[in-house]
Design a protein with these regions (language model features):
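Alpha-helical transmembrane segments and their cytosolic interface
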Residues: 5, 137-176
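Alpha-helical membrane segments and adjacent membrane-interface helices in multi-pass membrane proteins
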Residues: 33-92
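Hydrophobic transmembrane alpha-helices
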Residues: 2-50, 54-58
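Hydrophobic alpha-helical transmembrane segments
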Residues: 9-13, 35, 57-61, 79-80, ...
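Mid-bilayer segments of alpha-helical transmembrane spans in multi-pass integral membrane proteins
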Residues: 111-127, 148-156
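Short helix-perturbing small/polar motifs within transmembrane alpha-helices
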Residues: 82-119
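Membrane-interface helix termini and inter-helical loops of multi-pass transporters
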Residues: 125-138
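Aromatic-anchored segments of alpha-helical transmembrane domains
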Residues: 19-24, 64-70, 112-120
Length: 176
């Protein structure tokens, strides 16, 4: 097993702190919640930029736990999309690159995962709390069409952000 360096520990701590701060802000300011998911996802890429999978897992688990502790466990449904998809997506992208998975196959699997995560979120978070009753088939069709199209844009953006994060961390660590 590879030894974790001080830089990787620092990047993991920074990723956890940034992600937690963003998710707490998004949770208490509902209009910023989706933006908080996205930016927290980018912040979690910091340990992955140095190839630290253990640091990433630490940052992800710490982010989820601290956000629930700071906001209260009653906000679990607001954090559900982050916990079941957005927080884990950078790791899956990194594994896709490391093991050279076919792009179309990886996209198909990740799109189904995204659609499933959004369906679970709709069932638990919105389906139980909204007064408007949407037909089940309409929600599934909407998720499979619009959700997959939005996921394509999101996945493309996350891959571009990954390249920028890797370049930024590489420059910062070379400046010793």
């Amino acid at each position: 097993m590879k030894k974790i360096t001080a830089y990787e520990i620092a990047l993991s701590g920074l990723a956890a702190a940034l992600s937690t701060s963003l998710l707490v802000l998004g949770t208490v300011t509902p209009i910023l919640l989706f933006t908080a998911y996205l930016v927290a996802c980018v912040a979690l890429m910091l340990p992955l930029s140095r190839g630290s999978y253990a640091g990433y897992v630490f940052a992800f688990l710490t982010t989820g736990l601290l956000t629930l502790l700071f906001c209260g466990f009653s906000f679990l449904f607001e954090l559900l999309p982050f916990l079941i998809f957005f927080g884990l997506h950078p790791l899956v992208n990194e594994l896709q690159i490391k093991y050279k998975w076919k792009k179309w196959l990886a996209f198909f699997i990740k799109a189904l995962w995204f659609d499933g995560a959004m369906y679970v979120t709709w069932r638990f978070a919105f389906g139980m709390t909204t007064v408007v009753a949407l037909p089940e088939v309409a929600v599934v069709v909407l998720l499979l069409t619009l959700g997959t199209a939005l996921f394509w844009l999101y996945d493309y953006t996350v891959f571009k952000a990954r390249a920028q994060i890797n370049a930024l961390v590489g420059r910062l660590l070379r400046k010793k």
